[in-house]
């Protein structure tokens, strides 16, 4: 997979974006789960 120098590969952008989304969603569900658990 060749790309011109100075350009970020698309797969790297997708990987970082996907990881970021998973982390945000995971933190959201973890935070809501912990909040519900502590409120009970």
Swiss-Prot record:
Question: Mind telling me which InterPro entries this protein's record contains?
Answer: PSII_PsbJ, PSII_PsbJ_sf
Q: Which residues cross the membrane?
A: 8-28
Its localization reads: Cellular thylakoid membrane
Q: Does the keyword Metal-binding apply?
A: no
NCBIfam families annotated for this entry? PRK02565.1
Subunit comment for this entry? PSII is composed of 1 copy each of membrane proteins PsbA, PsbB, PsbC, PsbD, PsbE, PsbF, PsbH, PsbI, PsbJ, PsbK, PsbL, PsbM, PsbT, PsbX, PsbY, PsbZ, Psb30/Ycf12, peripheral proteins PsbO, CyanoQ (PsbQ), PsbU, PsbV and a large number of cofactors. It forms dimeric complexes.
What family is reported? Belongs to the PsbJ family.
Name of this chain's protein: Photosystem II reaction center protein J
Provenance organism: Trichodesmium erythraeum (strain IMS101)
Which classification does the entry list for the species?
Bacteria, Bacillati, Cyanobacteriota, Cyanophyceae, Oscillatoriophycideae
